Amino acid sequence: MNASFWNYPSKQKSWPIDEEMESLGEVIHPLDNIGGFDVRPGFYQMNGAYQTEEGVSFTVSSHGATSCVLLLFRPAAQEPYARIRIPESYKIGNTYSILVFGLKAEDFEYAYQMDGPADQARGLLFNRKHTLLDPYAKAVTGQRNWGEKPEGGKDFVYKARVVQSDFDWGRYRNLNYKFEDLVIYEMHVRGFTKDASSGVKGGGTFEGLRQKIPYLKDLGINAVELMPIFEFDEMESARVVDGVQLYNYWGYNTVSFFAPNTSYAFHQEHNHEGDELKRLIRELKENGIEVILDVVFNHTAEGNENGPCFCFKGIDNNIYYMLTPDGYYYNFSGCGNVLNCNHPVVRRFITDCLRHWAVEYRVDGFRFDLASILGRDQNGAPMENPPILEALAFDSILGDMKLIAEAWDAGGLYQVGSFPSWNRWAEWNGRYRDDMRSFLKGDSGVAGRAITRITGSSDMYDPASRGYSASVNFLTCHDGFTLYDLYSYNEKHNEKNGWNNTDGDNNGMSWNCGVEGETDDPAVMGLRRRLVKNAFAALLCSRGPAMFFAGDEFCNTQYGNNNAYCQDNIISWLDWNRLEEFQEIHDFARFMIHFRAKHPILRRDTKPAVCGLPSVSIHNGEPNRNYTDYNTHLIGIMYAGRNADDTDDDMIFYGMNAYWEPLEMRLPSLPESYHWKLVVNTFCEYQDGVDFEAQTQGDQTRVRVPERSTVILLAEHDL
């Protein structure tokens, strides 16, 4: 067999095989002519389409197909100008590969048609009339502008483009922050800047987000977690409710896993479709901010048996999806189908996809939506050691990627604290969210659990193995109330979603502080502001990585909607006018993020303090009452260790009073020559650049904590 079958193309205009052949005085020649196109077998180990000196190599695999036709389209055309049936002799194993001479990437788009058996009971859905998207497509055409009907209307087909890989990353370097040092800022690319109040050009795009990097850097976060940015169909299930157009806004319905979402690009660059995203990632990292992608490998946009067939269904339906014995789709995702993640073919596909984003886009990690689905076998049963999770944990390219699991699924599997990890996987700690929400709003009987969560959830994450670096602590995310709404609404208000308020979580553990929704009552608003500050103080004094939702730092609201997946409007968009209205909250959040950065003991163990104090100690709050008592609402935690540059001991006391009356707390004793200084009191209004009543404590044995407030004290040397 000719050597060219097995060589990889480089990312330049020529392939290594070209150079090798030229050095031998040989060139690659066509072997056949099909429909006027010179062709030869392509590059079998390079899935997808790649430009070469001679033309373009196309490679696609199917276990069940009996034939494969390559379709070539002029840009934006709906009908192909060429159909090239790939010869059976060009098929090795289950892989079709063909090199078409003379093609230039900018001149065409492509798709496939496959024939084979059609038997739904066996999960076989081959139909030679279906136009199929390349699973490895690096760019997808057809939905260029957000919310517009696809090109071609009801006859629309997805097509792929060949993308040039020549982006200049400059002096690129990995930031490689420790997991527990992360402060993660979860955001929706469109919603972050789409509202005119953002003040950027190209709002709702990667470019719009890029213009907000100075804001993010000043805030102090060191990682962004981008909600789905793979090509998705916002028009899926689009509908009008009360005169308002609703979309599949969040994007958890992937169309193409290797391609960035077309409508998120402000600059549409043919054959360089990913460059705007790459510029964003490059500048984020130049400013000290890692990039984590929210990825959806639990289901696809093809839906169930009533859904469209544009990719996996027509290529190998019974391999890519989990099917019941009678050929229907399991639905552990709640979205119509489930990817068969532990089938060897799908396992390789997922690994290849993540490698692509790690290499081509230089991302730093991935958050896996409904990750417990990746732990199910091909019949849907949970596995003790799922092959796909193990493969990703030990993959050589993904070796320094951050892997974060949403450790549950819609089928009832809940694995927070027990997700298979190989000491590589972290988890969204849903129990942190629930226990801390309960304590912060004043519930009884949860103080002990709150202390466990703040100090690293050792009941779930064994300090001898993963420890608290595996616990991604959060109080809010895209799914649920915003932080402001958590203290403004007792009940969800999802009526505008069109489901009679039946969708969304019914147990958000929220409290409206006495008035449902917006109010001008100064007492209510003062309490809400204080509770938001308490939440930031607790989150940023908790051991392990921290995460919050974009806009929480200036009290962005979704008006009580806790499931805004379909709202492409001010309900989901950030209202940057609130930054001025809630400047104090922003400044407090910024202060706490920077305070956490200056004091490593707040987020992880450091070298032991020379003075001999333990890394973490728990202190009684009310005299003669232990924090484990059912009715206590007062907790105190002291952290001790070495400071950031290992030049001195560092000691911090965190105290929280969730009770509705002021309470006194006993302060732990300090070593000789140290005294306590009050640096945070959430009862007081914060002024940027001025510590919260920063002063030496007159009484070094106790501190008065106002009702529903937090205090933080820092040990200082005596003068």
Q: What residue spans do the PLM features occupy?
A:
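Carbohydrate-interacting/catalytic domains
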Residues: 2-185, 190, 211, 216, ...
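Generic recognition of stable, solvent-exposed alpha-helical segments in well-folded globular domains
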Residues: 208-211, 224-225, 272-279, 291, ...
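Substrate-binding/active-site clefts of carbohydrate-active enzymes
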Residues: 188-207, 211-363, 370-394, 413, ...
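Hydrophobic faces of well-ordered beta-strands that scaffold small-molecule active sites
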Residues: 183-185, 224, 291-293, 366, ...
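Core domains of carbohydrate- and sulfate-ester-processing enzymes
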Residues: 110, 114-171, 234-254, 259, ...
